[in-house]
């Protein structure tokens, strides 16, 4: 990882710091394989909500009998 930073730093010596930071963030994202996905988080919230409704409905019906 240090070799990557050292090699790419020489290319960006004369450019803006923000360009270098954006490039490093892009490289880190590619290397770690992390993807930002807001759709997945909404899907997770929806599934948890549905599971809660099912559990509460089951408990309500169980108490009624």
UniProtKB/Swiss-Prot annotation:
Statement: the UniProt record of this protein carries the keyword Transmembrane: yes
Main subcellular localisation: virion
Keyword annotations: Late protein, Membrane, Transmembrane, Transmembrane helix, Viral penetration into host cytoplasm, Virion, Virus entry into host cell
Subcellular location: Virion membrane
Stated induction or repression of this protein's expression: Expressed in the late phase of the viral replicative cycle.
A single GO BP: symbiont entry into host cell
Transmembrane region(s): 40-60
GO (cellular component) term, any one: virion membrane
Mode of membrane association: Single-pass membrane protein
InterPro entries: Poxvirus_I2
Functional summary from the UniProt entry: Late protein which probably plays a role in virus entry into the host cell.
Family: Belongs to the chordopoxvirinae I2 family.
Protein name: Protein I2 homolog
């Amino acid at each position: 990882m240090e070799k990557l930073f050292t090699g790419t730093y020489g290319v960006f010596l004369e450019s803006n710091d923000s360009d270098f930071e954006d490039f490093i963030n892009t490289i880190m994202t590619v290397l770690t394989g992390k993807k930002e996905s807001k759709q997945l988080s909404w899907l997770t919230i929806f599934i948890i909500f549905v599971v809660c409704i099912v559990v509460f409905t089951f408990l309500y019906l169980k108490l009624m009998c």
